[in-house]
Amino acid sequence: MSERKYFGTDGVRAVAGEFPLTAGWVLNLGAAAGEVLKRRGERPSVVIGKDTRQSGDMLEAALAAGLTSRGVTVIHVGVLPTPGVSYLTRHLGADAGVVISASHNPYADNGIKFFGADGQKLTDATELAIEAAIDEVPNFAPVTGAALGSVTNYTEAERLYIQFLREHAPDLSGLKVAMDCANGAAYRVGPKVFQAAGADVFAVYTTPDGHNINRGCGSTHLEHLQRIVREGDYDLGVAFDGDADRALFVDSRGNVVHGDHMLLLNARARRDRAVVTTIMANMALEVKLREAGIPLERTAVGDRYVHERLHEQGLTLGGEQSGHVLFLDVAPTGDGVLTALLTLSAMKRLGTTLDELHDELVMFPQTLVNVRVGNKKAIARDEVVRAAVQEAEARLRGRGRVNLRPSGTENLIRVMVEGPDEAEIHEIARTLAGVVEKRGRVEV
């Protein structure tokens, strides 16, 4: 595969106003994307949505200008969660969708992520074709007159997305819910859907000003929501991130209920034949799923790897501790509001509560030791290190796990040991780190 110049694992992301997220470059990106889409058919259409960042307006205008300059019809859906844009791309039969968001990042950042007509992330081949076309924009043949594209503001977008979510909502009558909308894309959708399902909702961080998205709030800053739930008479709390593709819960006592808990609850209710998560999921989840007869498959860190494994194995349920949970039999992307609704539906079906779920899934202690080495790739292949890992795993006898992985940015090996006995895992981690450090000093 060719090396990427602009697209990362989640589209293009940077500080808005700095390269590549300048108005000029984004205009060229739109023109390049439009040209690639035109190769597949005349008059393609593209749905564009955004979160609440101030820079979204500038990027949206530049992208739309580029797309329409190549004859593309642009459908603006306004502020909407990322999965809402995915849904509307499919629902409206558009050729592609675009989300302008940087998810849980600070407001100064922004990003541009494309969806295909199926509502899923663009294929690598299509992204690479767009990248190649960016450099050719000055050489494109002019598009003029009636061949130019147009822009439509689609005012039914929020209503249609809410209608889709309500189809998957359980009866929440009598449930008192505190909700943190992160001053982000779910600030209207989240409360409306839960209220329509019958919940008594107290929503906070629903006044975006372009600068306050994710600031001390949302799924990465649960402290205020925990305090609200503890001090008020709430059954639970739920928090979304800036683009609402993930959700985390707080039980009635203020304890965090994260992705591991949600995967266990939903897998039991759905009787999935297997669940996919990453190497960061706690061993306690694996043990509980094993007791229920449900295998757990692990991938590298990142929701894209979970998504890929689900497709490869023909599975539908997977996710991460961060609250990014995939229900591929319901939607092709992670959806925070949908995740919350389906989790509460599973809770009702099994006759349990988030408090009981939190207390049942007791997380195994975990220790992480960073070891600086000369050649992190060589260490990962070293036979002495591998033998030490096997010895550590044998000592845990299936009651825990060991994971060594190189840092993505530094010459470090991260030694992680997890198990029910805290003293034992600390001792194992120290021993293993010592072997890694010693081998890291020699040519391996």
From Swiss-Prot:
Binding sites annotated in the UniProt record for Mg(2+): 103, 241, 243, 245
Keyword Repeat in annotation: no
InterPro entries: A-D-PHexomutase_a/b/a-I, A-D-PHexomutase_a/b/a-I/II/III, A-D-PHexomutase_a/b/a-II, A-D-PHexomutase_a/b/a-III, A-D-PHexomutase_C, A-D-PHexomutase_C_sf, A-D-PHexomutase_CS, Alpha-D-phosphohexomutase_SF
GO CC, alphabetical: cytosol
Modified residues (Phosphoserine): 103
SUPFAM superfamilies membership: Phosphoglucomutase, C-terminal domain, Phosphoglucomutase, first 3 domains
PTM text: Activated by phosphorylation.
GO molecular function terms noted in the UniProt entry: magnesium ion binding; phosphoglucosamine mutase activity; phosphomannomutase activity
Organism field: Deinococcus geothermalis (strain DSM 11300 / CIP 105573 / AG-3a)
Gene Ontology BP annotations: carbohydrate metabolic process; peptidoglycan biosynthetic process; UDP-N-acetylglucosamine biosynthetic process
Name listed for the protein in its UniProt record: Phosphoglucosamine mutase
Active site: 103 (phosphoserine intermediate)
Names of the cofactor(s): Mg(2+)
Ranges annotated as spanning the membrane: none
Cited function: Catalyzes the conversion of glucosamine-6-phosphate to glucosamine-1-phosphate.
Family classification: Belongs to the phosphohexose mutase family.
